[in-house]
Amino acid sequence: MSDRQAALDMALKQIEKQFGKGSIMKLGEQAERRISTISSGSLALDVALGVGGYPRGRVIEIYGPESSGKTTVSLHAIAEVQRQGGQAAFIDAEHAMDPVYAQKLGVNIDELLLSQPDTGEQGLEIAEALVRSGAVDIIVIDSVAALVPKAEIEGDMGDSHVGLQARLMSQALRKLSGAINKSKTIAIFINQIREKVGVMFGNPETTPGGRALKFYSTVRLEVRRAEQLKQGNDIVGNKTKVKVVKNKVAPPFRVAEVDIMYGEGISREGEILDMASELDIVQKSGAWYSYNEERLGQGRENSKQFLKENTDLREEIAFFVREHHGIGENSGVEDTEDSTRQD
């Protein structure tokens, strides 16, 4: 062994002794690790994410216009974590959490940790404490725009506080990103949309809270309503598009189309029916849908209702859809990048 190699080995041993095992390794060793994921609660979104769900130990940003379904998407993830026996927390900075609606989406409100902070600093400190405990599987912050700095709350109306919130988010994410990665917590930040003044060319839309969240996010999802869903003359929900704008663990720019039904959330039957029809697992002839020569119903809404009443058949079709896309129940791909990387 050369003197250079011996010196390097000694340095590596010293680093591991001081900072712990795994604090430094060769990239090839890192690549052998697989990404652990938790389902988003939507089959279409799991497929669009490319790894079968939200990657653990990462920052996720979900943004979009008002009433587009951002909180609904997040609550489905919480319900899925709880279904698997995990612990979830919700930082309600907007003070708008509806426990009745959350319960309808499958959230166990008796077990959900809820905080309604007075200031942005308080909300982020609570989030940090929960993440560092290592006992929380998912934490949702709703929303970044509502994380108002203490100086702004205590100041007078009309006072200028330029860049305060951006600095707050930048500092918080610098502290949080490493802890999130080590604890394997999924941190979902819900964000709103603002319009930049005076933009003549390009997209005038931006998200509040500065650039830090864009950099630290492993996945960024844009949620937008596409069209209204009607049953007869009644509007019963919205067809919603969820676009994966950024993805560090799989190819980005995939789009998931889901039905968000009023009072019910994401329609599992609707997304399974659409995806199975595209793959010809479910056959469509005129208005009729059929599976293995068994008719599911005439029209999309009737077929959805049939699958809702026949859960075994629904899950059988879902299994074939998952199998085709290669995501399985416990999917994962090779993890080749550090979540704290900002490029």
Curated annotation (Swiss-Prot):
CDD domains reported for this sequence: RecA (cd00983)
InterPro entries (alphabetical): AAA+_ATPase, DNA_recomb/repair_RecA, DNA_recomb/repair_RecA_CS, P-loop_NTPase, RecA-like_C, RecA-like_N, RecA_ATP-bd, RecA_C_sf
Subcellular location: Cytoplasm
GO BP: DNA recombination; DNA repair; SOS response
Cysteine disulfide partners in this protein: none
Database matches in SMART domains: AAA
Amino acids binding ATP: G64, P65, E66, S67, S68, G69, K70, T71
Name recorded for this polypeptide: Protein RecA
